[in-house]
Regions:
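Short, structured segments at the rim of ligand-binding sites
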Residues: 2-192
Length: 192
């Protein structure tokens, strides 16, 4: 949300409870300082001010994909093209590609120029559409392990053609001896 808020050019303050405001934001802080934008984080909140501009952005490829996704959502809305250079290693490629797939469904496109550089054409707009959010393989891992041990568990909403890296849990469980069948987006475990 931070880069999206920076499309307004206005001061925006994010607040939260508990430890939420203690989460490290150094990735964005560095980026904002390079852009001469205001970025102030305190226990009371996080304030950003100033507008992102089209151009070249550099970000470590081994940071949380959430930082990369934030820029992917915002940069195509700027009036000019931007490039996002990810400094290797790029550790969350599947999550970056998931973000790009969702964007494409809503009419916003980007493309890989090479293994670490994305081109984000500017001047795009998100268009409304009907979209089915697929199940989360990471969250499904817990009941999947239960099913592998006890059997009698069916998990629905797990797209077989997903880009989620955590879908590997099914292969891991199969190699450990789990017995399951897949029918569409459902996975049913039998006791091994």
């Amino acid at each position: 949300l931070i880069p999206i808020a920076s499309l307004t050019g206005q001061p925006v303050t994010f607040t939260g409870r508990g430890r939420l405001m203690e989460r490290p934001q150094s990735v964005y802080e560095t980026l904002y300082r390079e852009q001469n934008l205001r970025f102030e984080q305190s226990p009371a909140g996080l304030t950003v001010e100033g507008a992102l501009t089209p151009g070249d952005y550099r970000l470590a490829g081994n940071v949380s994909s959430q930082f990369i996704s934030g820029l992917l959502f915002a940069l195509p809305l700027l009036p000019g093209d931007s490039t996002l250079h990810l400094i290797p290693p790029v550790e969350s490629r599947s999550y970056i590609d998931m973000t790009r797939a969702v964007q494409a469904a809503f009419g916003v496109h980007s493309r890989w120029l090479d293994a670490t550089t994305l081109l984000l054409p500017g001047g795009q707009q998100y268009r409304p559409c009907d979209y089915n959010v697929e199940g989360d393989y990471s969250q499904a891992a817990f009941p999947a392990v239960l099913g592998a041990v006890c059997g009698g568990v069916t998990i629905t909403g797990l797209a077989p053609d997903t880009l989620q890296g955590d879908a590997a849990i099914l292969d891991i469980l199969r190699r450990c001896g789990a017995v399951f069948t897949r029918k569409g987006d459902s996975v049913t475990f039998a006791k091994a």
